């Protein structure tokens, strides 16, 4: 897919990995819808920077834990930009809540944002994407491919994203491709100290941490070159999953 001039919606695009995706897609000439949940200031700053550089970008706030807001978001993008070519479902929450401590509200919040929202966003975006042979990229992580004992709701939600990717790939073919990226240690939690970072590096076969650019390159591959790839989850973890 030639990206220049096309429109991408990146959920959770105001911070961290989502921001890296936004900046990369804008750099490819895409017009970018930057979704945010609670990070309005960050989203506005990202868009201001992009506009100063000559890119076309706009912010769209929505609490994706609310099904009504998730369902309505794609139509807002189309109303603003006139089309939608790419959906990147990167908004997520990763909360450390062991099994015995997980409340119904925590479970629902995590599953609604991480899994339910990507489904309904894809559902509502599908007619627009199909018209232009568009693409969906979901962001999973290693927690969806192995059990994280202290993150039960998160692990379940991301495992669901992996299967959702397969289901949507079949359901939306041949007009839309649907794939996922499962990043490993490409952007570690902000509160990790040097000891934790060193441990992660030493327990990764490639003996280093990744960078956001590693995940960005995976996204660009799927969008620009992966026209015959659908239903797959591309693991970007330096081989870390192999040591489990």
Give residue ranges: language-model regions.
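Canonical Rossmann dinucleotide-binding motif of NAD(H)/NADP(H)-dependent dehydrogenases/reductases
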Residues: 2-33
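Substrate-binding pocket helix/loop in short-chain dehydrogenase/reductase
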Residues: 98-99, 106-111, 200
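Active-site helix of classical SDR
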Residues: 122, 157, 165
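Alpha-helical segment proximal to the catalytic Tyr-Lys
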Residues: 127, 169-174
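Residue(s) in the substrate-gating loop at a strand-loop-helix junction
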Residues: 141
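Short C-terminal tail/terminal secondary-structure segment
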Residues: 145-146, 220, 224-244
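Short, small/polar-rich loop/turn modules that mediate ligand/substrate recognition or access, typified
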Residues: 173-177, 230-231
